[in-house]
A protein has these predicted regions:
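Noncatalytic, beta-rich nucleic-acid-contacting surfaces in large DNA/RNA-processing enzymes
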Residues: 1-182
Length: 182
């Protein structure tokens, strides 16, 4: 028999989760995506509900799914709900995103964690956060010098996600660009 105390604990936990989902939705989604959604892929989920639904349909159309795909499907369903409620994600940003937490930027916006990018591990993310606190990166070259745990593959991942758009590739100044008035 299932003890009543366990049943009561499960009911209390379900009630608390439901309360947060209704009354503090951004806190709920921040915690859910940061803790309960290991399959969160910022490259996919931060690009809008249309892409989320397309991937959901693709996974639902498969007869057999792996455990990773099942986790992805659950995460996609919660992301779809997130978008339907009028919320949005910002792109991953090396200056704003935390290592492994989703940050609440305002009542409508979550900033995904650095580790939500596939291929960007916790050690590299921590290294980036530690170094950004010491000062801005002058270039991706500077990032590679200052962050020994960041590889060229991580830089490619960040570049593909648009997280390095405002940072030049090298520390060298282009004389022609400087003279043309940029």
């Amino acid at each position: 028999m299932f003890p009543r105390a366990h049943a009561a604990a499960y009911v209390m936990m379900a009630y608390r989760i439901a309360w947060f989902k209704v009354h503090q939705p951004m806190a709920f989604y921040s915690a859910y995506f940061g803790i309960r959604a290991p399959a969160f892929d910022a490259n996919l989920m931060c690009k809008g509900d249309g892409l989320v639904m397309e991937k959901t349909r693709q996974l639902q159309g498969q007869e057999k799914r792996t455990a990773v795909e099942e986790d992805m499907l659950t995460t996609l369903e919660v992301a779809h709900e997130f978008y339907r409620r009028g919320y949005r994600f910002t792109p991953v940003d090396i200056y704003k995103s935390a290592v492994d937490q989703f940050l609440i930027l305002d009542n409508q916006t979550l900033a995904p964690s650095l580790t939500s990018l596939p291929g960007l591990g916790e050690a590299a993310a921590r290294n980036i956060v530690e170094e950004r606190e010491k000062g801005k990166f002058m270039s991706t070259e500077d990032m590679l010098l200052r962050c020994p745990k960041v590889t060229k593959g991580v830089v490619e991942t960040l570049t593909a996600a648009g997280a390095l758009n405002d940072i030049p590739k090298t520390n060298q100044i282009d004389l022609f660009e400087m003279l043309s008035g940029s």
